[in-house]
């Protein structure tokens, strides 16, 4: 986010939490999407169906969340992953939520949405950011909801061994306009600064009394 004004105001912390990966189910096949003699219409129908499937997945994810509030699965966030190796892609729900936000903002036909893609128009974000998976070994400590500093455990015990905790963090890029101010802000009238903001996610931690448990901790989630 871009903080604009002088003096600067503190950014409030937003809470969030969601399931790690709900089951994905799709229906239909290519034959149901287009006729054998109409390839052009088939491709258009396929694109529209893909958009419809994504929106259904988002709705299904919300239902799954509400039905599993008291289960262990609710302990995981879309930005937290338990894995034996470094994840190769961003969290699935993270991508779906980003796509949903884009569709809601566009509120137009699929064809217009594709042509209005910011990448096609050469638009640039106000603040540049970078996202990557980090381990508990890199984080070591974090601040929980009570303001206490807790130790982030690197490994989580599971029935067949142990898995590592990975966190998908987003922060302001050290290059570009991060130090010079927000892009597009008139420096003659405003002081601006790109700042990394945080949100809460659930993670396995240990407090200063050696008590281990799942707690909400703050991690970098946006710029």
UniProtKB/Swiss-Prot annotation:
GO terms for cellular component: axon; dendrite; extracellular space; synaptic vesicle. It is found in: Secreted. Its main location: secreted. The keyword Glycoprotein applies. The keyword Amino-acid biosynthesis does not apply. Glycans are attached at residue 107. This is Neurotrophic factor BDNF precursor form. InterPro entries: Brain-der_neurotrophic_factor, Cystine-knot_cytokine, Nerve_growth_factor-like, Nerve_growth_factor-rel, Nerve_growth_factor_CS. Keywords: Cleavage on pair of basic residues, Disulfide bond, Glycoprotein, Growth factor, Secreted, Signal. Residues 1-5 form the signal peptide. It comes from the Eukaryota. Promotes the survival of neuronal populations that are all located either in the central nervous system or directly connected to it. SMART domains: NGF. Residues 6-114 form a propeptide. Belongs to the NGF-beta family. It comes from Aspidites melanocephalus (Black-headed python). Disulfide bonds join 127-194, 172-223. One of its GO terms (molecular function) is nerve growth factor receptor binding. GO terms for biological process: cell surface receptor protein tyrosine kinase signaling pathway; modulation of chemical synaptic transmission; negative regulation of neuron apoptotic process; nerve development; nerve growth factor signaling pathway; neuron projection morphogenesis. Gene3D superfamilies: Cystine-knot cytokines.
């Amino acid at each position: 986010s871009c903080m604009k004004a002088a003096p600067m105001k503190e950014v409030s912390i937003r809470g969030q939490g969601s399931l790690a990966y709900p089951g994905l189910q799709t229906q239909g096949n290519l034959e149901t999407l287009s006729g054998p003699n109409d390839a052009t219409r088939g491709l258009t129908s396929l694109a529209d169906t893909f958009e419809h499937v994504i929106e259904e997945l988002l709705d299904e994810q919300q239902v799954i969340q509400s039905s599993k509030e008291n289960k262990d699965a609710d302990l995981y966030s879309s930005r937290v992953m338990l894995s034996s190796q470094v994840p190769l892609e961003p969290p699935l729900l993270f991508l779906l939520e980003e796509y949903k936000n884009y569709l809601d903002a566009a509120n137009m036909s699929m064809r217009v949405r594709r042509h209005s893609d910011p990448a096609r128009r050469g638009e640039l974000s106000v603040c540049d950011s970078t996202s990557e998976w980090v381990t508990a070994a890199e984080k070591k400590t974090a601040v929980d909801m009570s303001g206490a500093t807790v130790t982030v455990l690197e490994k989580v015990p599971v029935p067949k061994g142990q898995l590592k905790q990975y966190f998908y963090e987003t922060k302001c890029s050290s290059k570009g306009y991060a130090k010079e101010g927000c892009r597009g802000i008139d420096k003659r009238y405003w002081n601006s600064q790109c700042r990394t903001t945080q949100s809460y996610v659930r993670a396995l931690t240990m407090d200063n009394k050696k008590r281990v448990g799942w707690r909400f901790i703050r991690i970098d989630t946006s710029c």
